[in-house]
Amino acid sequence: MNRERQKKPEWLKLKLSTGEHFAATRQLLSGLRLNTVCRSAMCPNLQECWSKGTATFMLLGSVCTRTCRFCAVDKTVLPVPPDPEEPEKIALAVKSMSLKHVVLTSVNRDDLPDGGSGHWVSSIRSIRSLNPEVSIECLVPDFDGITANADRVMQEAPEVLNHNIETVPSLYPAVRPQADYRRSLELIERAKAVFRLSTKSGMMVGMGETGDEVAASLGDLRASRCDIVTIGQYLQPTAAHLPVNRYVTPDEFEEYKNRAESLGFRHVQSGPFVRSSYHAEEFVAARHIERC
């Protein structure tokens, strides 16, 4: 039985509203033909974020070379080449939106020799050239385990280096067949050990994991010197995606938060609608970003 089609609990019902910035944000992003993870990944927080004039920019197109079963982003083996004007367009959007903190992410581009890392670098530099005061969070893919490609992005010294483990290792074959749990942990640890970046990761719950497995993964992240963690409810994007196994209660999310804090994470967000880039600017505003 597809549990996602059961009645959702009250805590998962959103009141949709649009503020004064919503239409302006939508018009700006559409006019520049920019991709956002908000729209491409069917994020439940799109209304809230766009209404506040914030968005997470998605680099390298809107089509991914991976087939993760939880993700709403379109898939193909051979996407179109990256738009060479995209870095400048994003920089212009950041300036137009008067952002103080910008989150960049991307699809996986296993079809490109550098995994898209050169495009990442161009985007970071374009943003900083036009917006020298802005802080940048990079939510990166694993670059297929090619260290040189990941290093190219880390060398740009983003204020936050984010890479999501997404789920517990036992679910990787079913949920993330082309990814590797240990490889993701190694990327996070390298960002801290070699480049001294503030590190972040996130995971979804409700896909069939146990509480003990979540606790173990939180421990693995801390052992890999991850500073910030986000935990949110998995929601099935379409009938073709992985079904929801169960709805995690707010009390359980609070327990996960307490567990993470006890392990020493410097900042924790845990709740049904938490996503990796949700309220990301708060981490910077609260001065959690330090080179250590």
Curated annotation (Swiss-Prot):
Kindly state which keywords UniProt assigns to this record, in alphabetical order: 4Fe-4S, Cytoplasm, Iron, Iron-sulfur, Metal-binding, S-adenosyl-L-methionine, Transferase
**Matching SMART domains, A to Z?**
Elp3 (SM00729)
Q: Which Pfam families match?
A: Radical_SAM
Give me the reactions it catalyses.
[[Fe-S] cluster scaffold protein carrying a second [4Fe-4S](2+) cluster] + N(6)-octanoyl-L-lysyl-[protein] + 2 oxidized [2Fe-2S]-[ferredoxin] + 2 S-adenosyl-L-methionine + 4 H(+) = [[Fe-S] cluster scaffold protein] + N(6)-[(R)-dihydrolipoyl]-L-lysyl-[protein] + 4 Fe(3+) + 2 hydrogen sulfide + 2 5'-deoxyadenosine + 2 L-methionine + 2 reduced [2Fe-2S]-[ferredoxin]
Its annotated pathway?
Answer: Protein modification; protein lipoylation via endogenous pathway; protein N(6)-(lipoyl)lysine from octanoyl-[acyl-carrier-protein]: step 2/2
Q: Where does [4Fe-4S] cluster 1 bind?
A: 38, 43, 49, 277
Q: What is its main location?
A: cytoplasm
Q: Which GO terms describe its cellular component?
A: cytoplasm
Residues bound to [4Fe-4S] cluster 2: 64, 68, 71
InterPro entries attached to this UniProt entry:
Aldolase_TIM (IPR013785), Elp3/MiaA/NifB-like_rSAM (IPR006638), Lipoyl_synth (IPR003698), rSAM (IPR007197)
Designated name of the protein: Lipoyl synthase
Q: Which source organism does the UniProt entry give?
A: Chlorobium limicola (strain DSM 245 / NBRC 103803 / 6330)
What phylogenetic lineage does the species belong to?
Bacteria, Pseudomonadati, Chlorobiota, Chlorobiia, Chlorobiales
Question: Which gene is annotated as encoding this protein in its UniProt record?
Answer: lipA
